[in-house]
Each structure stands twice: as C-alpha cells, then as structure tokens.
Amino acid sequence: MKGLYFQQSSTDEEITFVFQEKEDLPVTEDNFVKLQVKACALSQINTKLLAEMKMKKDLFPVGREIAGIVLDVGSKVSFFQPDDEVVGILPLDSEDPGLCEVVRVHEHYLVHKPEKVTWTEAAGSIRDGVRAYTALHYLSHLSPGKSVLIMDGASAFGTIAIQLAHHRGAKVISTACSLEDKQCLERFRPPIARVIDVSNGKVHVAESCLEETGGLGVDIVLDAGVRLYSKDDEPAVKLQLLPHKHDIITLLGVGGHWVTTEENLQLDPPDSHCLFLKGATLAFLNDEVWNLSNVQQGKYLCILKDVMEKLSTGVFRPQLDEPIPLYEAKVSMEAVQKNQGRKKQVVQF
C-alpha cells in the first residue's frame, strides 16, 4: 500500500514529495477508526507551523482532508460502525497520510457524511468550511445586516466564506484579482453588493468600501494577506494586488472586526491608536487551533457537522477542480504548495 509523504531539506524551506510503501495497519486501537479513503483534498502544508510544533520526522504524511468508508472500529468507539460514510480532517501529528488507501484516525476527528454529498465535495470543502466558520462565527460574530468585505472572493476559501455570509443575511463586498475572477463573482446568487476589481492596481479598495457603506465602513474584513510596507520596500511577489494594512484600518467601521491570515502582521503605534479610536478588534485566523487543543472538541465537531449539512442543502457550492487519480497527486501537490491553483484539487480513489 503506497502513501504520499514529504521530506524537508535541512538547509532551506524546499520540500520534496515522495511515494512510500506503507505496511498494512495493525488491529484498530481503542478509540481509533480504520477508514478506506474515497477522496482526499490537497492543501498547502504549513512547514513553519510543523517546525514550531517541534515535529521532527524524516517523512511527513501528506493529505489531511479525507472522506471515506469505515472498515473497522476500536473497542471503545461509540460514534461509528463499519460501513458508515465519514469525513474529517486528520490531526497535524497523524502517522498516516490521507493520500493512501487506508488510514487510522481517532473517532473525535470525524463526522458522518450525508448521503447527498459526494466524496469529492465532502473532502474538498471540509477545511474551507471550518476556516469560514472560524473566521465569521467565532472571530467576528457575523449576524444579519452586517457588512462583510471578503478579499479574493473567487478563491476556494473565499467562495465558501461568501456563501456562509450570504446565508447569515450579511451584505457582502469582495475583491477580484483578475477579469475571470470578477466574472465569476458577478454570477453569484444572491448577488454580491459590490465586486472591486483590483487587477489593474488603480482601484482604491478603501474608497470603494466607504462609498458602498455610505462612509460608515465595513463591520467585518476577512483578508487574504496584506502589505505591511510601502511599495518600494515590499518584495515584488508580495506586492501583487494585496491591500496595504492602512487601507484595511481605514475601511473598518466603528466596532469592526478585522480577521487576518497574515501571521507576521506588524502594527505601528499610530495603527493601533486608530483601531483603538474605532473600538475595533483584530483577530488572527488559524484554523489549526481546533486540532491543537482539545478544549473545544465539541464545538469543532458541531462545525464539521454543520459544514456537511450546508453542503447537502446546497448552501455551500464549493469550487472544485476535476478529481485526479492518486498517481497524479505528487505533481498536483507540488503545484498546490507553490499556490498555483485557484480551485480546490481533490484526489479520488
């Protein structure tokens, strides 16, 4: 049985993906479930986080968002039985790669998959669903009538976040990084209040948002990375179409919430003072926290269930690429790690 793993060279950040033979799994332990994987979604690997967690291994397993059929359960498993269809996210310290035919996983990382939902949809939207819930429900308390700016709304994550915001009755503004993205966002139903095309670099995001909200500013901003410095000091790659942190602070309304994905965000005293005057809050979106601490395991499982329910009722309509077979996973994973794809890539078994 083959599984996909990655190796990190000691000198630099470069990682290489390798298929490795894996011995057959032993008898299932107490609280563990043995799964036959039907689909596994590909996501970027946060090597920095793994290093900070002091997880030193020669080979790290690849692929964490999985959907599959229960083959066997341990003696203390209470939620599942053989032949159940399940979906979940493997923890960071999982021994088994999701990109493998059979895996072992603790029952507290899984929920039942509704019949209506396909394997690829389940695996392809579980992680983005968790991220959207974390950002909009737990970090910014989304409620009907609020205005939400979702940066890069045509990305796989942006799409789910927009659909969740619309479902909760919020007014959504979004940015598009290309003409294709703009057309995609304009086709959304219910319609997005305003699509800001930032591809030519001439449109000012803050001005557009203030205009749309009658000068009041938006209640919630969900960014997709920000520029920390002026154009001359920022590396060229980083420059591409990202808003400056001052723009985001400017367009935030009184009592607004800024949810950022920029882990190295630095705010100067004048920035902090401006946020203080607005009574605004800043939150960091790290969806791994649910799996790094078991304190809120119940909440986490409720989120997973809710994401599946919204998939089955058509609230979530994920942007998925054509499913690929396992033997193409290595090449696809290299592209995903370089952040080259727009739609979510899913391996189907």
Curated annotation (Swiss-Prot):
Family according to the record: Belongs to the zinc-containing alcohol dehydrogenase family. Quinone oxidoreductase subfamily.
Cross-referenced Pfam families: ADH_N
Gene that this sequence comes from: CRYZL1
Transmembrane residue ranges: none
SMART domains with a match to the protein in the record: PKS_ER
InterPro entries linked: ADH-like_N, CRYZL1, GroES-like_sf, NAD(P)-bd_dom_sf, PKS_ER
Subunit structure: Homodimer. Component of the FERRY complex composed of five subunits, TBCK, PPP1R21, FERRY3, CRYZL1 and GATD1 with a ratio of 1:2:1:2:4, respectively.
UniProt keyword Transmembrane helix, yes or no: no
Compartments where found: Early endosome
EC top class named in words: oxidoreductase
CDD domains: enoyl_red
Annotated GO CC locations: cytosol; early endosome
Tissues of expression: Ubiquitous.
Protein name: Quinone oxidoreductase-like protein 1
A molecular-function term among this protein's GO annotations: NADP binding
